[in-house]
């Protein structure tokens, strides 16, 4: 049997039973204890990915500093799934907005190595540009999409729905 509880009720109960108003040490958001919320930590981490992707690009090919910016919107072509439905759009968007594929390209670049230096360099540059895109999206709060709405992400609601729960 399942019991539906409100968000407020969920925040007031932990494994040891009901919390008092002054017992904030067991909350999961960290903010009550003076810490950072998990979404904030994730945004900071993704900002670091952006910095590392730029540094990697500058290290590999300083003259192509503009490359991550030039291909930035190409990764957003994955939103084409939204023409079908929010669920299809979330699936195609999330399939592209993950660190898995940039990692696969980076490994392919390493494997190509000295046997094909031009291929290796371009695979690595594309992987860095892809990681730059994903990292910047998440650092700005554009997380992985949930199937119910484009504006509903794993980091919360975005756009006109930010700070609300429209459903």
Protein language model regions, located:
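N-terminal membrane-targeting hydrophobic helices
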Residues: 2-167
